[in-house]
Amino acid sequence: MALPSVDTLQLALGSSFSVSELERTNEVSGKVETVLWILTPFLDTKNDAIYVTLRESENSDGNTLLYISDERYASDFLWSIPMFRTQGKKALKMVRKLIRHNNTVLHNGYLFIRLLPEEGKDPVFVANQIKNLTRIILIVTSLPITMSKY
């Protein structure tokens, strides 16, 4: 399985998203991997652009899967929720339910969607999953939660 082409994914996402290809070193394996960097049209609470990445990776069974990953926003926020008050716990339950119903995984500090080889071949399906993850990021990072005192 291969990553969708930049042009095909750009067409499937629409002109408000920006797709570019870059190479980076995987921190775990040390290998250089190709990553599609997707800049969304949305801003986080600090007015920084929200982005997600799309990369190939082999799972423990030896299957190559596509991973759509939020490497910063919702992951950081979700892992800090237990330090918040009661409304934070309610928000976490709501977000976990949302994640379950959108084929999304929260694991080891990352929020991501795994796509099987047959799903990864359809650029429209991939684009819809990117949009689903973006929606979750927007919902999670805009939750009005006040921090408790330590």
Task: Enumerate the language-model features and the residues they cover.
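Nuclease-adjacent, charged terminal/linker segments that flank catalytic cores
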Residues: 1-135
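Hydrophobic, aromatic-enriched interface-forming segments
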Residues: 132-150
